[in-house]
UniProtKB/Swiss-Prot annotation:
GO terms under biological process: in utero embryonic development; liver development; N-glycan processing; negative regulation of neuron projection development; nitrogen cycle metabolic process
Glycan-modified residues: 72, 469
Subunit field text: Heterodimer of a catalytic alpha subunit (GANAB) and a beta subunit (PRKCSH). Binds glycosylated PTPRC.
Binding-site residues for Ca(2+) 3, renumbered to this chain: 222, 224, 226, 228, 233
Annotated protein name in UniProt: Glucosidase 2 subunit beta
Null mutant phenotype: Knockout mice exhibit early embryonic lethality by 11.5 dpc. Conditional ubiquitous or kidney-specific knockdown results in polycystic liver and kidney phenotypes, respectively.
Source domain of life: Eukaryota
Organism: Mus musculus
Region (Disordered): 226-267, 280-350
Localization in the cell: Endoplasmic reticulum
Length: 521
């Protein structure tokens, strides 16, 4: 197409056909000077001398192509050496040069420079550059197609290899799973036995400590040390009160002793201790760890003056109050609950014996082997899924877009960095830091029916505030390099991105032989 345009540009050698001003070459046969003129819409026929007489006779304005008489008429710019052009007849002789050859201002007094040759030269250079890009891009496109053919064959071979190896790996997994389960059975039994023995030892130790607490409480309650705890001795501990009046009555004490008046050590532990253990408070104060006093900086005090007689009398009076306070401070300490022994190393489960540890090590080795092969199987299955997806993906008529599959491209603007990962996602993030926002994930090819692979659609991006989810259309343009050239937001939350790629280059027409005699515009 581009070369065809280049061939149409050289018009300097074309034969000039006589026709009224403003008439195109394709319409000259309607304007024969020897015949009356019929309006192009067929509504009227007029003498030929009324064509371009600056009076509008035809409704369609076709009788005044070279004047501004008809508001709906059109003037044809020949623009020899460049592209012909139609302009509104109202713009003829308006003092503005609309045609590059200046023919529209033939009677306005405005002098128009003929710029058609220069415009044609620049147009030709631009088209030649575009044609060169198309040729080079298409050359690269053919390479991309061949590379995908080779890569696809390699991936298919790799897929077959993985699918064949998968069965062998699945068999290994099942074999090692059975070996693991076989090794874990004695491991569980050995661990359970070890824990059971330790828990029994802990229970025995706990019972022993409870007996020691009960014995200690019995000794404290047995004030006369006769080997028996009586009702009176039990009543010395009001905290054992059961009716909430703050005192342990004789009836309450007797109820605690199961109706007896006293109890020995054995009965005390079997019957009494369980009822009082949570309320009982020991008379032995706990050993407090001295807290070091904080030393405050000494303040300089003024010198002490000898007291006056009145001050001496005032100082003598508080002495009695101080003595009373000292007596209160000497009151016996409150009863304390018996202190349970702090946890020791004996309460931690001991290490396994050599035989049990050997069983555990064997089970662990079986687990490690199984997990390693199972992990390899999962990685193989993921590779198979990935290869199947890539091989079956629609990468264009000949797979020319396949090379984009594992790539990402960025475009940095004043505010954002846009990132396109073809066939995966589009995102944007603030240029100066911040989390990315999804502008859509791969949806489908979105070009028109006759050019399906000219655009991509990415959908279901991050939702806009009180709006739809973001989406992006990517237009694919022919270029020698792969680069994102622009990103815009023509509609709210709908983005348009342009990607230059050799894969979008069409096949150019054959180059026409150059004509040395007619190379001027």
């Amino acid at each position: 197409m581009l070369l065809l345009l280049l061939l149409l540009l050289p018009l300097c050698w074309a034969v000039e056909v006589k026709r009224p001003r403003g008439v195109s070459l394709s319409n000259h046969h309607f304007y024969e000077e020897s015949k009356p003129f019929t309006c192009l819409d067929g509504t009227a026929t007029i003498p030929f001398d009324q064509v371009n007489d600056d009076y509008c006779d035809c409704k369609d304005g076709s009788d005044e192509p070279g004047t501004a008489a008809c508001p709906n008429g059109s003037f044809h710019c020949t623009n020899t050496g460049y592209k012909p052009l139609y302009i509104l007849s109202s713009r003829v002789n308006d003092g503005v040069c609309d045609c590059c050859d200046g023919t529209d201002e033939y009677n306005s007094g405005t002098v128009c420079e003929n710029t058609c040759r220069e415009k044609g030269r620049k147009e030709k250079e631009s088209l030649q550059q575009l044609a060169e890009v198309t040729r080079e891009g298409f050359r690269l496109k053919k390479i991309l197609i061949e590379e995908w053919k080779t890569a696809r064959e390699e991936k298919q071979s790799k897929l077959l290899e993985l699918q064949a190896g998968k069965k062998s790996l699945e068999d290994q997994v099942e074999t090692l799973r059975a070996a693991k389960e076989e090794a874990e059975r004695p491991e569980k039994e050995a661990k359970d036995q070890h824990r059971k023995l330790w828990e029994e030892q802990q229970a025995a130790a706990k019972a022993r400590r409870e007996q020691e607490r009960a014995a200690s409480a019995f000794q404290e309650l047995d004030d006369n040390m006769d080997g028996m705890v009586s009702l009176a001795e039990l009543q010395t501990h009001p905290e054992l009160d059961t009716d909430g009046d703050g005192a342990l009555s004789e009836e309450e004490a007797q109820a605690l002793l199961s109706g007896d008046t006293q109890t020995d050590t054995t009965s005390f532990y079997d019957r009494v201790w369980a009822a009082i253990r949570d309320k009982y408070r020991s008379e032995v104060p706990p050993t407090d760890i001295p807290v070091p006093e904080e030393t405050e900086p000494k303040e300089e005090k003024p010198p002490v003056l000898p007291p006056t007689e009145e001050e001496e009398e005032e100082e003598e009076e508080p002495e009695e109050e101080e003595e009373e306070e000292e007596e209160e401070e000497e009151a016996p300490p409150p009863l304390q609950p018996p202190q349970p022994p702090s946890p020791t190393e004996d309460e931690k489960m001991p290490p396994y014996d050599e035989e049990t540890q050997a069983i555990i090590d064997a089970a662990q080795e079986a687990r490690s082997k199984f997990e390693e092969v199972e992990r390899s199987l999962k990685e193989m299955e993921e590779s198979i899924r990935s290869l199947e997806q890539e091989i079956s993906f629609d990468f264009g008529p000949s797979g020319e877009f396949a090379y984009l599959y594992s790539q990402c491209y960025e475009l940095t603007t004043n505010e954002y960095v846009y990132r396109l990962c073809p066939f995966k996602l589009v995102s944007q993030k603030p240029k100066h830091g911040g989390s990315p926002t999804s502008l859509g994930t791969w949806g489908s090819w979105a070009g028109p029916d006759h050019d399906k692979f000219s655009a991509m659609k990415y959908e279901q991006g991050t939702g806009c505030w009180q709006g739809p989810n973001r989406s992006t259309t990517v237009r694919l343009l022919c270029g020698k390099e792969t680069v994102v050239t622009s990103t815009t937001e023509p509609s709210r939350c709908e983005y348009l991105m342009e990607l230059m790629t050799p894969a979008a280059c069409p096949e150019p027409p054959p180059e026409a032989p150059s004509d040395g005699d007619h190379d001027e515009l």
